[in-house]
């Protein structure tokens, strides 16, 4: 890959992975508009590692508490709030994992098109706007039930359709279910960790089995740039979301969807 391709694509992945604007919609733009080649499996693995590093470092304290609480519940020493959240995250990951295993080939073959991505970018952008305009509720992470987590998990499975936006659809579902904006985003970001691990691990296995040549400079740069940009986005999104709401992202998605249709 050319250096400029590595820089641009890594920044796109890092910036868009955790914002509700669809990373796949943005990654297809250089290919459709500029004629850039596909970034390849190795680079996909690299940016997965980068975004996973960002969210794991940002939520390191939460992750530590969740792991300790979950282990306590497993060993019969009682289940606290963090332990329950750990179980909820596991349960909410199952739908996306199953759907990914079953429908991965179908999605890659038939749904990774500009038309599909443009349509889902528009449709789920409007849905995000509707969810954000609901009467405000103050339900927090400690208030959610297993059923709430499972519904958000099912919504995450829908994000396997390119253009949906994993963070966008999970935040949308959480808002519909009454979570405040900040905790809707926090649950979405925590839920991304096992999904990125599974997706990145699967792609990593494919890479190993393919025995393809690896450009280690591109890999290292991709990891670093996607990690730093994703970390910055998580930080500012969580700090400003209650003030700015979802409307700026909705407007952006609508403009992006129209641009994609024009680019076809």
Curated annotation (Swiss-Prot):
Superkingdom as given in the UniProt entry: Bacteria
Entry-linked InterPro entries: UppP
Transmembrane segments: 1-21, 39-59, 87-107, 111-131, 144-164, 187-207, 208-228, 244-264
Record carries keyword NADP: no
Reactions catalysed according to its record: di-trans,octa-cis-undecaprenyl diphosphate + H2O = di-trans,octa-cis-undecaprenyl phosphate + phosphate + H(+)
GO cellular component, one term: plasma membrane
Any one Gene Ontology molecular-function term assigned to this protein's record: undecaprenyl-diphosphatase activity
Membrane topology note: Multi-pass membrane protein
Keywords: Antibiotic resistance, Cell inner membrane, Cell membrane, Cell shape, Cell wall biogenesis/degradation, Hydrolase, Membrane, Peptidoglycan synthesis, Transmembrane, Transmembrane helix
Entry's localization field: Cell inner membrane
GO biological process assignments: cell wall organization; peptidoglycan biosynthetic process; regulation of cell shape; response to antibiotic
Entry's EC annotation: 3.6.1.27
Catalytic class of the enzyme: hydrolase
The UniProt record lists the keyword Cell inner membrane: yes
Pfam families given in the database record: BacA
Family of this protein: Belongs to the UppP family.
UniProt cross-references to NCBIfam families, sorted A to Z: PRK00281.2-4, undec_PP_bacA
Entry-linked PANTHER family: UNDECAPRENYL-DIPHOSPHATASE (PTHR30622:SF4)
Other comment: Bacitracin is thought to be involved in the inhibition of peptidoglycan synthesis by sequestering undecaprenyl diphosphate, thereby reducing the pool of lipid carrier available.
Role: Catalyzes the dephosphorylation of undecaprenyl diphosphate (UPP). Confers resistance to bacitracin.
Name of the featured protein: Undecaprenyl-diphosphatase
């Amino acid at each position: 890959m050319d250096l400029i391709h590595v820089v641009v694509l890594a920044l796109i992945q890092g910036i868009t992975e955790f914002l509700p604007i669809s990373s796949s919609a943005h990654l297809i733009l250089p290919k459709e508009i500029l004629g850039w080649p596909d970034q390849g499996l190795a680079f996909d693995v690299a940016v997965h590692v980068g975004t996973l590093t960002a969210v794991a470092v940002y939520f390191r304290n939460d992750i530590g508490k969740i792991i300790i609480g979950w282990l306590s519940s497993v060993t019969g020493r009682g289940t606290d709030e963090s332990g329950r959240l750990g179980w909820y995250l596991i349960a909410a990951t199952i739908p996306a994992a199953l759907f990914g295993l079953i429908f991965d080939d179908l999605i890659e073959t038939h749904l990774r098109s500009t038309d599909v991505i443009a349509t889902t970018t528009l449709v789920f952008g409007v849905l995000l706007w509707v969810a954000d305009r609901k009467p405000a509720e103050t339900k927090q992470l400690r208030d959610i039930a297993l059923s709430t987590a499972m519904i958000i998990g099912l919504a995450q499975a829908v994000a396997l359709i390119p253009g949906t936006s994993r963070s966008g659809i999970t935040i949308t579902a959480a808002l519909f279910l009454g979570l405040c904006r900040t905790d809707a985003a926090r649950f979405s970001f925590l839920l991304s960790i096992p999904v990125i691990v599974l997706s990145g691990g699967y792609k990593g296995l494919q890479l190993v089995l393919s025995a393809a040549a690896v450009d280690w400079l591109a890999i290292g740069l991709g990891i670093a740039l996607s990690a730093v940009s994703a970390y910055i986005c998580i930080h500012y999104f969580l700090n400003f979301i209650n003030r700015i709401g979802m409307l700026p992202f909705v407007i952006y998605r609508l403009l992006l969807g129209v641009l994609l249709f024009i680019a076809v």
